[in-house]
From Swiss-Prot:
The lineage of its organism: Eukaryota, Amoebozoa, Evosea, Eumycetozoa, Dictyostelia. HAMAP family: Ribosomal_uL11 (MF_00736). This is Large ribosomal subunit protein uL11m. It comes from Dictyostelium discoideum. Keywords: Mitochondrion, Ribonucleoprotein, Ribosomal protein. The keyword Ribosomal protein applies. The keyword Ribonucleoprotein applies. It is found in: Mitochondrion. The gene is mrpl11.
């Protein structure tokens, strides 16, 4: 799934008028793009205005994601050095690791145990993000409940593959 803002959609029309020079696939932390290597030199070799890219990227991603979350970005550059970028949905495993960073670091044996309510709440947050990623104008009432339920079940399956399990209650 890709997301392109209205500003980037307008730039896309301009960029696509000329032949495309390069399409770059990058992984950048949300709101943390800067001139430091490897990103700065990588953009510099194509001659684009990197300061403009960093400002655009940081302002758009700060609104949508937590700072530092690894995002996949596709950057299109044409022969006139004009550019636009598309954001791709972060991997679910990356989102889960971001939510449970402290627990993953403290885990023994690689298995992470989370309370049932917290795990379901976080899975619903990720599912809502997935359902609304392409359609930023969608609100909670517009999300179809059956797709949300299916998405939550998929995320719970991803939790299992990432070794994130439900903590058993002590009274059971």
């Amino acid at each position: 799934m890709t997301y392109i803002s209205k500003k980037q959609a307008a730039k896309k029309v301009i960029v696509r008028e000329k032949p495309i020079l390069v399409r770059l696939k990058l992984i950048i932390g949300a709101g943390t793009a800067s001139m430091t290597p490897p990103l700065g030199p990588n953009l510099g070799q194509y001659g684009i205005n990197s300061i403009e890219f960093f400002n655009d990227f940081n302002t758009e991603t700060k609104e949508l994601f937590e700072t530092g979350l690894a995002l996949r970005v596709i950057l299109w550059i044409n022969v006139m050095k004009a550019f636009y970028f598309e954001l791709q949905m972060p991997k679910i495993s990356n989102l889960l690791k971001e939510y449970y960073k402290v627990e993953c670091e403290a885990a023994k044996g690689g298995n992470v145990y989370i309370e049932k309510e917290r795990l379901l709440k976080d899975c619903f947050k990720i599912a809502i993000l997935l359902c609304t990623f392409n359609k930023a104008e969608k609100q909670w009432e517009q999300i179809e409940k059956k797709y949300l339920r299916i998405t939550v079940l998929e995320i719970l399956g991803t939790c299992r593959s990432c070794k994130i399990y439900v903590k058993k209650a002590e009274n059971e």
